[in-house]
Every structure is written in C-alpha cells, then in structure tokens.
Amino acid sequence: MGIKHLFQVIQENAPDAIKAGDIKNHFGRKVAIDASMSIYSFLIAVRSEGQQLMSESGETTSHLMGMFYRTLRMVDNGIKPLYVFDGAPPKLKSGELAKRTARKAEATEAHEEAKETGTAEDVEKFSRRTVRVTREHNAECKKLLKLMGIPYIDAPTEAEAQCAVLARAGKVYAAASEDMDTLCFEAPILLRHLTFSEQRKEPIQEIHLNRTLEGLGMDRKQFIDLCILLGCDYLEPIPKVGPNTALKLIREHGSLEKVVEAIENDPKKKYVIPEDWPYQDARELFLHPDVREADHPECDFKWEAPDVEALVEFLVKDKGFNEDRVRNGAARLQKNLKTAQQSRLEGFFKPVARTDEEKASLKRKHDEKLQEQKKRKKEEAKAKKEAKAKPRGAA
C-alpha cells in the first residue's frame, strides 16, 4: 500500500523534488528494484481477456512474462537492475496484512459471484482484487532472474528498506518501487513506473528525498511522522485526518507526540485516536529497519551472461513461451548488459552540497509560495461567497 496521498502532498508542496523523464535518461545506472511490488503489478497487469496468463498445464505465467519482458526493456535502455525480495514482515505489519487477507477473501467470493451473475467488467475488477504474490511466484521469478544473469538478493524484512541502504551507500543510483514508503526508509532517490509496460506511456518519476524535506520544511523524523499520519502499512490512519490536515498538524505541532496530545486535549474532540495506535513503534521501524549493511557478503551482486539453453528449457518447454522471442530476448540481454557497463559522466563528479545561505533562500521562497497559495485560496473563497450572496438576475 505505501503511504496514502504522499505523492500528492509532495507534488503540491515540494514540486521541485519530482522529476519526470524517459527511461533512456537512466542509461548506465544500477537500480535496486522492489521485487515483490513488481511481481504483484505483473500479476495484475499482464493479462489476456481479463484473466492471468496460463501455461497449457494451467499454471499462472503472468509474473514470468512480466519479469522477463519488463527486465529486458530496462536492459535494452542501458539500466542494470538488481531485484530485492521481501523477507518476513515486521510484527507490527501483521494487522495490516490480516486486513488485506480478509479483503482478498471477500474479493474472491465476489469474483465467483460475478462469474455467475455479473458483467465482464465485474469479473475482471474482482479478479484483480484477489491477486496475491505466493512463495511459488517468488521462487519462479528468482529462477528466471538467475537464468537471465540478473542478480537478486533477499532482504531480512522490507525490500524497500534494503533498496534504500544500497542507494545510500552508492551501490545503486536509486531504489525503484511504487510504494512511497521507500522515502521513509531514507532512499535518496525513488524511481516509480520503472517496471511499467511501454504501452502505458508513463514517464519515469524520479523523487529526491533531500528536495522533498527542503520543500516541506521538515527534518526526516517529522517527515516520517507526517507519513504515519497520512496512513502507512503499519497503522490505520486517524479517521477524518486527510492529507491537508496531516500536513497542517505536523507543521503546527512539530511531532506526533504533540499532535496526539493536542487531539486528546481538544474539547471539541474533532479527531479520535484509534484505541491501539503504537505510532512510536511504527516510527522506529522506519528509522531503524531490519536490514543488511551494504558491505554485507549477501549484498554482493554482479550481472552475468544469460544461460540461453536453460532459459529456453524453463520458459519454452515448461511454461509455453514462444521460443523465437525467448532466444531473441537472451541475445538482447547478452548485448545490452555489456553496453550498460559504460560509465555515465556523472559518476566522475560528486554533487555539491547546498550552503546554509542557499537552504535559507529556498525555505524563504517556499514560505512565500505557501503564503501566496493561502492568499489565493482566501480570495477564491471570498469570491464564491459573494457570488452565492448575489441575488439572481442582478447585473
């Protein structure tokens, strides 16, 4: 799920943190990819007539089709992908996972009913809601990656957190995931839409954490508190607290402790904190996740030549893929992984940190922009009020 409405908050309040561009812009870069999120998206998106792709023996192959061709697309564009798989989820996440399981069970029931009485659209809608990444899906994708010569590692817990460690250490350029909580784990750069199909024509979103914090006028701890208020995988959100209110509360009070205190002491009781809401534990999971350091032996990885005949055996003979396409893909892998070895010019230079004066200037511009937005909203509200009060037929 990630963080509810976080992209919207960044887009509206720290627009300079987001850069949209073509996949070709990332030529020569190594990227750590959240594998589980990618596989989930493949199971949902790679379909035929609303149903997941199947082999002749009735096995699902959408995850393998997506993994093979989307990885090929990245390598064709000079990107060197590293996939990171989830480990065991943190205990605090079990409540959210239980809710997801219950929702999927309801969707499965609704899917069966829709097949009997509903439209084709109903069937597809509920079918997508039943999707779950299994151990078998993960195991088959790992086997495929190994045969393709693409490295992968297993995270102790959250894949996004492990991707962030590798990005901070400079072993990869960025972490790639659709989950915005990757920023909470201190990934310097988050790439979104990297594993989308070319047909969707979605630009790659590049989100910079330092510019996000500067634009919001927050430190990392306050940013995490904001994300918890918005709604994360570990806790249910506070009812009636939307993105604008969450941002206002953190800016006004500075921390979740003070936000909770203000809510509990509010005589109007406008908001109610859920009974079991261990926000400090959630914050700790973001600040100190269970990860392996970048120099750990299990974080070593390298790209190798694909095993063409084993790929054909697995994808063509076992899973029913087209042999010509698989062999063509393997040839592209061999050629383009060598090409991706070329270094980008940016690798020879270190970015220059902003001075205190530059940071102060940015903050001042941001505050002025906020004041201008508030002023404009007041004027718009006043104009609407006057328009409503104006009698009909008046000139």
From Swiss-Prot:
SUPFAM superfamilies to which the protein is assigned, alphabetical: 5' to 3' exonuclease, C-terminal subdomain, PIN domain-like
EC number: 3.1.-.-
Principal EC category: hydrolase
Cofactor note: Binds 2 magnesium ions per subunit. They probably participate in the reaction catalyzed by the enzyme. May bind an additional third magnesium ion after substrate binding.
Nucleus as UniProt keyword: yes
Principal location: nucleus
Protein location: Nucleus, Nucleolus; Nucleus, Nucleoplasm; Mitochondrion
InterPro entries in the record: 5-3_exonuclease_C_sf (IPR036279), Flap_endonuc (IPR023426), HhH2 (IPR008918), PIN-like_dom_sf (IPR029060), XPG-I_dom (IPR006086), XPG/Rad2 (IPR006084), XPG_CS (IPR019974), XPG_DNA_repair_N (IPR006085)
GO CC term (a single one): nucleoplasm
N-domain: annotated segments: 1-104
Post-translational modification: Phosphorylated. Phosphorylation upon DNA damage induces relocalization to the nuclear plasma.
Segments of this protein annotated with the region Interaction with PCNA: 341-349
Binding-site residues, Mg(2+) 1: D34, D86, E158, E160
Pfam families: XPG_I (PF00867), XPG_N (PF00752)
Chain positions recorded as Mg(2+) 2 binding sites: D179, D181, D233
GO BP, one annotated term: DNA replication, removal of RNA primer
Assembly notes: Interacts with PCNA. Three molecules of fen1 bind to one PCNA trimer with each molecule binding to one PCNA monomer. PCNA stimulates the nuclease activity without altering cleavage specificity.
Protein family according to the UniProt entry: Belongs to the XPG/RAD2 endonuclease family. FEN1 subfamily.
Name assigned to this protein: Flap endonuclease 1
Classification lineage: Eukaryota, Fungi, Dikarya, Ascomycota, Pezizomycotina
